[in-house]
Design a protein with these regions (language model features):
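Histidine-centered active-site microenvironments of extracellular/periplasmic hydrolases
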Residues: 2-13, 134-154, 167, 171-222
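Catalytic-site neighborhoods of secreted/periplasmic enzymes
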Residues: 1-93, 209-212
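Structured segments of extracytoplasmic/periplasmic soluble domains
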Residues: 21, 114-118, 130, 145, ...
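Proline-centered loop/turn at the N-terminus of a beta-strand
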Residues: 17, 122-123, 177-179
Length: 222
């Protein structure tokens, strides 16, 4: 139930503050959650979500392909949010819907604010960026800048995000007393469900390097 306090939540397992997305960015509901409540939700426009069947009358990628700005290559043909068809169906919560192009700025800003507010005490910050997960929709600052299509552009955006966090630590003179860990939950995947020309625009880039496999595999590159 996204219309009231969400249970369970990260405070239940020891976090003091949370600003998260409920699923992955290619899944509904496309909203932010702050301290167990959907950000900007109008109680008169409640959210309904279902992964088994359509709810509401919002356009879908399957029924309204003319309404999408990013076409699916596999799956990803359910409710259209911000011109992008997602996994699952939702309706309601219009005032709370995110704009994909702004997600990196918003999450990075929240992380910087957290660091600044805890600069005088020990803190633990877990920041999970949406890049380079699909849909790959960079902010206009990065769109078209990599020469490798949207996938390359969001890698640039991710690099900017990391730089912003590092610069914040440096500006507060706490970088030398901070352990910074950068890691991924899985290896690379090129075409992950949207027609974003990731394969066509690799331009010699080999994300897996000399390792076997990739995301969804049990080999080294997975």
């Amino acid at each position: 139930d996204f219309n009231h306090e969400i249970k369970p939540n990260t405070q239940d397992i020891g976090f003091d503050y949370e600003f998260i997305i409920p699923a992955t960015v290619d899944r509904v509901p496309c909203v932010f959650v702050e301290n167990a409540h959907v950000v900007g939700l109008d109680p008169k426009d409640p959210i309904t979500v279902n992964y088994n069947h359509k709810v509401g009358d919002w356009p879908t990628g399957l029924e309204n392909p003319e309404s999408v700005k990013m076409k699916p290559s596999q799956g990803h043909n359910n409710t259209i949010i911000n011109g992008i068809p997602r996994i699952g169906w939702m309706t309601g919560g219009k005032s709370a819907l995110w704009v994909d192009e702004d997600i990196a700025d918003i999450i990075t800003g929240k992380a910087k604010d957290f660091i600044i507010s805890h600069k005088n005490e020990p803190f633990f910050l877990y920041m999970g960026t949406q890049d380079v997960h699909v849909p790959r929709v960079p902010h206009p600052r990065f769109a078209g800048k990599s020469g490798l299509g949207p996938r390359g552009d969001v890698i640039l955006q991710l690099d900017w995000t990391v730089g912003e966090i590092m610069r914040t630590l440096d500006s507060l003179n706490i970088a030398d007393n901070t352990i910074f860990v950068f890691c991924s939950d899985n290896g690379p995947v090129i075409d992950d469900g949207y027609q974003d020309q990731a394969l066509e625009l690799l331009n010699g880039h080999t994300p897996m390097k000399h390792y076997r496999g990739g995301k969804y595999s049990s080999f080294d590159a997975g």
